[in-house]
Amino acid sequence: MELYLDTANVAEVERLARIFPIAGVTTNPSIVAASKESIWDVLPRLQNAIGEEGTLFAQTMSRDAKGMVEEAKRLNNAIPGIVVKIPVTAEGLAAIKQLKKEGIVTLGTAVYSASQGLLAALAGAKYVAPYVNRVDAQGGDGIRMVQELQTLLERHAPDSMVLAASFKTPRQALDCLLAGCQAITLPLDVAQQMLNTPAVESAIEKFEQDWKNAFGNLNL
């Protein structure tokens, strides 16, 4: 199972990498724009934060296949081993096919249906990123879509994997894992929600109070 953080906040990546067993960091144009840093400045800093073994993801901006391929090559030259995110449009599928031939690893992003995700996988994307909460927000069932996509990949594109994205709650992320997803990416607020459990803090405080009442200190 691979756990990623969905952010371009280098300081938060450094902080949470000490706590979470993260496999890397995913970004998108909106996330990079929010950082107020050039993508060519922030990507090396993110790679440094996750270490050489961590996997970094960045997205192209072009709308046509030729431009996507050119941008993917620029990203790969800047950060060797980066996974290039390609929106799963008609042009995006053509770009994914070409990049597969050239040995550049891709992720099919902006996936709103299982059929769309399957096409990305068949085109050669190693990862496929369904947008769970965004599907829910449009009146669909994000978790069910992930379940369908997971089944399709297992049967017809076993070399690809679901990297579920777009979460608002830890429950959504857990449901994706229960559906068989091998990878998820968490925005910072959802990652923090997993850590901030009031009941846990209350239990620890009770342990400390009982110990202090018995022994007068909090030392072993």
Curated annotation (Swiss-Prot):
Encoding gene, per UniProt annotation: fsa
Higher taxonomy: Bacteria, Pseudomonadati, Pseudomonadota, Gammaproteobacteria, Enterobacterales
Lineage: superkingdom: Bacteria
Keywords assigned by UniProt, alphabetized: Carbohydrate metabolism, Cytoplasm, Lyase, Schiff base
Residues of the active site: K85 (schiff-base intermediate with substrate)
EC nos: 4.1.2.-
GO molecular function: fructose 6-phosphate aldolase activity
Subunit structure: Homodecamer.
Compartments, record wording: Cytoplasm
NCBIfam families: fsa_talC_mipB (TIGR00875), PRK12653.1 (NF009296)
Pfam families (alphabetical): TAL_FSA
Protein name as it appears in the record: Fructose-6-phosphate aldolase
One GO cellular component term noted in the UniProt record for this chain: cytoplasm
Family membership: Belongs to the transaldolase family. Type 3A subfamily.
Gene3D superfamilies: Aldolase class I
Biological-process GO terms, alphabetical: fructose metabolic process
Catalytic activity, as annotated: beta-D-fructose 6-phosphate = dihydroxyacetone + D-glyceraldehyde 3-phosphate
